[in-house]
Amino acid sequence: MKIVIASDAKQPNATYRGALLAAGALPEEVVVVTPGDPDPGAFDGLLLAGGADVAPTLYGEAPGTPTLELHPERDALDFALFSAAEKLGAPVFGICRGLQALNVALGGTLWQDLPSQRARGVSHETDVNPHARKDHPAHVVRARPAPSLSRFAAAVVALEGTSVNSRHHQGVKDLAPGLVPLAASPDDLIEAFERPGGGFLAAVQWHPENLVAERKQKALFEAFLDACRARASASGRAGEPLVFDSLEGPLAVVKLARPAVLAAALASFHDHPGPPASAGGPDRPQ
C-alpha cells in the first residue's frame, strides 16, 4: 500500500504522517510529495494537507482581498494528484486547504476571506500565535444528517458537539455538485463533506492530525486507511505504474471533473512562478 501526502515544500508534515501512523499505517507506506518532486507513481490513497490559499482564479473570481497568500505550485500539484487519484480510483482525504481544493476541483467556490466577507461571530483563524498549541479549541462542530452510512460519515456524526481547532480564513461558499455536507460550525460554515458512492472522497476543515490522540478524531484517519487498504488489495498493492500524460513529474495533466481548473492552475504557475508560501500563511502549517 502507498499513501501520498501532498504538502507545501516548506511545511513540516510530520504531523500528518504521524496521524496516519497512529491510525495504523506503516512508515514505508506513507510518501510526502511537494511541488517539484518526481512523479510518485501509482498510489492507493491521497491526503491533501493544509497550506496556503487556493487561488480565486481557479473558481472564476478575481483576487478580492489583500489577505490572500497564494502558492500556484501547490495548486497545480494538488489538482494533478487529485486527477491521478480519480484515474486510479484511489481514496482522497482533504484537510483544511485540502477540503477547499477538493471543493474547487469539483466545481465549488470559496469565500476568499471569512472575516471581511462573512463575519458571523465565530473565529475560524484562532491560531494567530505561531507558538500556540495546535490543538487549541476554536468552536464545536454540528453534524448534519447524511444519506451515507459510510465509516467516515459515522466518524463525523460521532463528533457532534465536539470542540475542534481552526486555522483558516477561507471556507466553502458554494458546495460542489455531488458533495454532501456532513458537519458545520455554529455559524453554518461547512466543516466536513463527502462524495457518496464511487469510492472514498471526504474532507474536514479543521486539523484532526493535531487531535489524533482523541479516539474520535483518529477514527477519521482510520476510515481513510480502511479505504486505502481496500483499494490496495483490489489492485494487487498499487496497480499499474501511473503514466502522466503531458508534463513531467507531478504537474501531470489527467482529465478533471472540472478541466478548466488544472489549465488555470498551470497557467498561474507559469505566469507567477515565485517562491513557496511562508510558514506563517493563512492556513498555518503544522
Where would I find each of the regions flagged by the language model?
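N-terminal beta1-alpha1 cap of cysteine-dependent amidohydrolase-like domains
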Residues: M1-F93, N103-W111, P115-S163, H169, ...
